[in-house]
Every structure is written in structure tokens, then in C-alpha cells.
Amino acid sequence: ILIIKMKSGNADLPYLLSDYHLVMLPSVDGKVDWASGDGTGPYKIVNHEPGVATEFTRHEGWHREGAYFDGVRLTVLNDANARQTALITGDVDAITDVDLKTISLLQRAPGVVLDNVASGSHVTLPMFCDVAPFDNVDVRLALKYAIDRQEIIDRILFGYGSIGNDHPIAPSLPYWADLEQRVYDPEKAKFHLKKAGAEGLKVSLSAADSVMSGAVDMCVLYSEQAKAAGIDIEVVREPADGYWSNVWLVKPFVFVQWGARPTPDVMFSLAYKDDAAWNESHWQNPRFNELLLQAKSELDDAKRTQMYAEMQMLCKDDGGTIVPFFRNRTMARRENVQHPEEIAGNWELDGARGYHRWWFS
């Protein structure tokens, strides 16, 4: 019997127990044995080279469904062309993060099947709310009105995504609030700039294509769109190495990509709560934090829905984060690799469980 002692109520506990961060490993002399490679999944690690590849073999004693492969090798191929070439030539059986610029060519390749799955994965452009000029909510609103989200989806994602509304809850997820969609409106942006006394606003926006293929192009397009509102956005192309240690959470206006989280509480607690380590916009909103605490333990689904709707509205209208879009998961596989009719979109390769759920035909 597993007994979990909690400091406070959490209605999402069943979902948290399925999150990939929760792992169970062998214990040796009362300490976790990280080196054995054994866990509770269907495969065990036989070789691990960080940044190169990881190899798994199926546990002989696995008795549940799945784990149809005798072994699995996950290879790191950061270059999109290298990934797609490896798939076409048959060197690998499946790839993640298909290059959207060449996706139409890949679709025509013989023996290749594309998977396109709606996801809660999203891009954020967080602004430090405690650093000028972003400490003024009207400046933040001006920058939110100065971005043409649909054009970005069309030109950067080639249609493989859904429009964002400046909060992190995707239309494909529970508790999504059908709020009025913020649209590109340079005149409203000018209104808020004038209200803030920030006409002629100039800001720098940092990005790197290592975060997402097309990240810099997206920021350049945003910069062009913002000119109609009289906003000058200087796009800073940052080095790929060290982006997460030297740019994210360090510079006041940056490009970030988030994976989906299982519930609104997890996402809000990670990146929007006032004292969260990953509060990337330094946003402080007492009402939001009050609702976050209440919703965490609320078992009445109707009340919880209302709370999360208000929280999404607060993010949209007061928060320091622009959420331009949610990305689809675009993956590709050899036609002899099969999977269930429905696959997960929270992480790549069927919620990072493709090796468990998929099979060869």
C-alpha cells in the first residue's frame, strides 16, 4: 500500500502520479540506485551517452500490455535535415519535430507517414514585470496587441498550430476558457502606449533557433508587425549554447517554448505563481495566487472551471506573458511503424511513450 502524506488538498493528484517527473527506482542501503538503469517501466537502460544516444532493452519480466520492441535506441539528431534524411533512408524508424518548411516534401517521400497532433505545447514571450518598461501594464498590452498571431501561424508554423490568447491553457485541454480572442490591433497598441507615456517604444527581444526551428524568423516577423504600432523591436539572435542558463530567466524579453502540462494547476504553479522558480515574467498578482490556492483543492468541477477562467483572464489582461500560439506535434515514421488510433500530444512521440505503445507491422 502506497500512502501519500500531503500538506494540503490537491484535486489533481491522480494526474500528478502519471507525470513523467515521478519516477521510482531501486533502493540500495536506503539510497536511490541511479546507476542500475532499472525503473518501473517496460525497458531498462543499457547505454546512455548524454547528447548522443540512449539504448534500452525490454525487461524479461514485463507482463503488462505494450513493449512490443525487443530494444529501442533514441538518437540525438539536432539538425532537422539530418533527422528527415535518416528517416527517408531507413536509418531510423521515427523522428520528432519535423521541419515545417519542408514538411510537404517529407509527406511525398515513399514509405513515410506523418503524424500531426494538437498539443498544449506553446511559445511564450515573457516580459519582466518588475523591469521598465514592462512594469507598466499598458506597455504589456501594447506589445500584446502589436502581434499578428494568425500571420505567424500561417507563415512560421505553416498552419500546424492554433492561436494563443496570452494564457497557457490550450483549446485542446480541459478548463480552457472561451475568452474573447485578442487580435492584432495596432491602433489599440498605440492607445496603450500613449496611456503609458511610452510612445516610440524600443525594446530588445532575444531568441535562438535551438529553442524552436523558426524562432528567430518569428521574432523578426513580430518586429515587422509591431512597426505599425510605432514599436521598435530589436531581435537579438542569441547563441544556441547556454540559452537556458544565460538568456531565459536572465534577460527581460525572450523567446521560450513550453511543453504541455497535464493540468492547469501544474502549468500555473510552475510559471505563473508569484514565488515560482520558473516565474519567467516576474508577474505578481494577489488575486491570481488566491484563486490558484483555492482551485488546487476544489472538487466541485463547475466552481473550479470558473476559477480557472478568471485566472486565464488575469493572465491575458494583466500578465507579463505573450502566448502567440500552441504548436501541433508533427512527427513522422516509417509506414511499418504502427500506433493506436489516438496518440498523445503533450510530448513528442505519443507523450514520450511511443516506445511503449507502438509496434512494427
Regions found by a protein language model. Give the residues of each.
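Gly/Pro-rich hinge or "lid" segments in bacterial periplasmic/extracellular proteins
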Residues: 8-9, 15-71, 79-81, 186-187, ...
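Short helices/loops that flank or line small-molecule/ion binding pockets
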Residues: 81-91, 108-109, 137-138, 217-229, ...
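Short, well-ordered beta-strand elements
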Residues: 2-4, 41-44, 54-55, 70-76, ...
